[in-house]
A protein has these predicted regions:
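Terminal membrane-proximal soluble interaction domains of membrane-associated proteins
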Residues: 2-81
Length: 83
């Protein structure tokens, strides 16, 4: 993993670049870590569409992670500030 320990990925936010199919199969996620971006195989409990923002909740090792859909809780406040 280019020197990045698996545990570092947990809690990172990523963008789905290949949709996941839930238990039917993985997709792919782009995660920003340590000043760069890397792709990982992404597994999820439910299907997640391409373009969705996700949270890495577990590492499976060997460049594979479990993800969950994520909505930034501060996004609502940022939208209010723009009005």
């Amino acid at each position: 993993m280019a020197g990045i320990p698996d545990e570092v990925l947990i809690g990172c936010i990523g963008k789905i670049i290949v949709a996941t199919r839930g238990v039917a199969g993985p997709g792919e996620v782009l995660v920003r870590v340590r000043g760069g971006s890397e792709t990982f195989i992404a597994w999820s409990a439910e299907p997640v569409p391409k373009g969705a923002t996700v949270l890495v909740i577990e590492s499976r090792g060997h460049r594979a992670v479990d993800v969950s859909p994520w909505t930034d809780p501060l996004a609502e406040f940022e939208e209010d500030d723009r009005r």
